Amino acid sequence: EKNIHARVESIGADGALLTIKSGEIYRVNFIEKILATTLAKLSNFIPEAGIWMNTQRPEWNDANNALVGNGVSMVTLYYLRRFLSFLDQTLAKSITQQVEISEEVSNFFKAISNTFTQNISVLDNVISNTKRKEITDALGIAGSNFRNQVYLHSFSGKKATLDVKELISFLHVALQFVDH
């Protein structure tokens, strides 16, 4: 926090922005921004339950609906579901075939995607508590690994290519888990 305040004093409001290892302000494209947000939500997903409330406080929409903030948020899950569907439809119409994303976000994406695809067969039945915990832990570890990488080592500045078709396939699988 002290470093951020020092950068703000030195260069202004841009000093609060993320930087890569070299100290340059880190800039990314729109797909990476929304993908990082989506992956962060999915890393807190509990199958057949909702989105884990890390702060254990209700979000504004939960509180307005008199939902207790303990545990998981179905409201956040419903908003995520709506967004996944919107993104799927939008990308399906896009002529873009590939996007460049940060290597770190690419690794995060692969970890979340692999967790879902490796466990797709559980959607044939009710998910056991053991399997639910296994999936939840794998998603959570993916999120923790991403956060630790960025917090401890910053972004490397290296890019990876993501096929839009792969992203669309991921959205389909994620929607299957959310809808289960």
Regions found by a protein language model. Name each.
Residues 1-180:
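Acidic, mature catalytic/reactive cores of soluble proteins
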